[in-house]
Amino acid sequence: MTANDLWIPRSKRLKRPYQPRYNRDCFGELIQIDGSYHDWFEGRAAKCCLLVYIDDATGKLLHLRFCEAETTFDYMLSTRAYIEQYGKPLAFYSDKHSVFRVNQKSSQDSQITQFGRILNELNIDIIFANSPQAKGRVERANRTLQDRLIKEMRLEGISSIAEANAWLPCFIEHFNQKFAKCARNSKNLHRPLTESDAELEDIFTWQEPRKVTKNLTITYDKCIYLLEPTELNHKLAGQY
């Protein structure tokens, strides 16, 4: 097959060129998000993950948060803090991590992740990058942070996630003064956050649809839960 050019060995295939993507024009139009797992404290604490939110148009760091791992709950906390500070961007730009996208489909799985559901309820789009090169701004920021942020935390004597998270707003301010640039268009495309605190509490919770049986029970995680036989709960029988 190789001799007849029906199959080309991987080592001899032409490398796919990754063409540059122009940055967006407006602040808040596209926010790149990523998690960077690294020895951030140089052995003074366990390896952990830094969640990074960076504006595509300006290169501004908008949110940083250390956490033990790149989980849905940590992205929930970071995203809520972000939108409460800046409002709702038009879109987030991420890789295809399982937090953002269902990668293994089955008949029992939802076709949307918890994080995807949250963004859908907030009317925020999410765009998936097909390669690390496609989200170059946040990848470059990660490399810069793995150098500059580590050195500054060493000088500050910071040795824990809690200490680092309390100090990060100061670092973000100085970082943006040095590295951020002006957008081509001065318009801010963040939309006001109109949801109440109670509505946000409901949106930023883990939600799983379950059917209420005629016996007023629901099943979740191999456990059966009994609902109180109230008039309201009787009306829920047969519903999700």
Which functions belong to the PLM regions below?
Residues 172-240:
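C-terminal, beta-rich DNA-binding module of retroviral/retroelements integrases
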Residues 33-62, 72:
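An active-site-proximal beta-strand-loop segment
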Residues 83-108, 132, 188:
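Acidic/histidine-rich, metal-coordinating catalytic segments
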Residues 108, 114-184, 189-201:
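Charged alpha-helix within mobile-element recombinases
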Residues 44, 65-66, 103-108:
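Short, solvent-exposed loop/turn segments at secondary-structure boundaries
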Residues 1-33, 38-39, 104, 110-113, ...:
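Basic, flexible linker segments flanking DNA-binding modules
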Residues 46, 64-91:
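Active-site beta-loop-alpha junctions of metal-dependent nucleic acid enzymes
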Residues 1, 34, 53, 59, ...:
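Mobile genetic element proteins and their domesticated derivatives, centered on retroelements
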